[in-house]
């Protein structure tokens, strides 16, 4: 698409997949623990996994923006991260930016009447945000 439309921009690519050996190294070091009442992860589990993908927050997006990225192509992330990252980079309140991002990621489905096919716009201020369809 970029070539066909003759577009030019600085793009960042953020991977979210982990190498199996890295995960096993962290497991042996005791750096991995269960989240909730689930069995401990084993090296066998790691070996059997086809892909190991982590969910990232806004930090990698902010780093990409600080590096001059105009477009970011990323793996799995916490849904509000893409919406909150620019606001956080620019010093806005984390709670407000994340709250607005969480609503925006669901878009107009959060409105009455709800619609998964419509867009929503958010404007963030120092102490509040405004959403509009």
Predicted regions and their residues:
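Catalytic cores of large soluble enzymes that bind and process phosphate-bearing ligands
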Residues: 1, 49-56, 92-95
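Gly/Ser/Thr-rich loops at beta-strand to alpha-helix junctions
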Residues: 1, 76-82
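Catalytic or ion-translocation cores adjacent to nucleophile or general acid/base/metal-coordination motifs
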Residues: 3-19, 83-132
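An acidic, phosphate/nucleotide-engaging active-site surface
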Residues: 18-74
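Glycine-rich anion-binding loop/nest that anchors nucleotide
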Residues: 72-77, 115-119
């Amino acid at each position: 698409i970029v070539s066909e439309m003759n577009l030019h921009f600085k793009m960042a690519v953020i991977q979210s997949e982990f190498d199996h050996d890295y995960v096993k190294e962290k497991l042996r070091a005791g750096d991995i623990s269960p989240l909730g009442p689930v069995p401990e992860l084993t090296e066998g589990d790691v070996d059997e996994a086809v892909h190991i993908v982590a969910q990232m927050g806004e930090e990698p997006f902010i780093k990409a923006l600080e590096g001059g990225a105009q477009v970011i192509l990323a793996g799995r992330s916490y849904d509000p991260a893409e919406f909150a990252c620019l606001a956080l980079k620019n010093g806005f309140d984390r709670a407000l930016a994340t709250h607005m991002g969480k609503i925006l990621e669901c878009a107009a489905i959060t409105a009455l009447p709800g619609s998964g096919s419509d867009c929503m716009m958010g404007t963030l201020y120092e102490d509040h945000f405004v959403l509009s369809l």
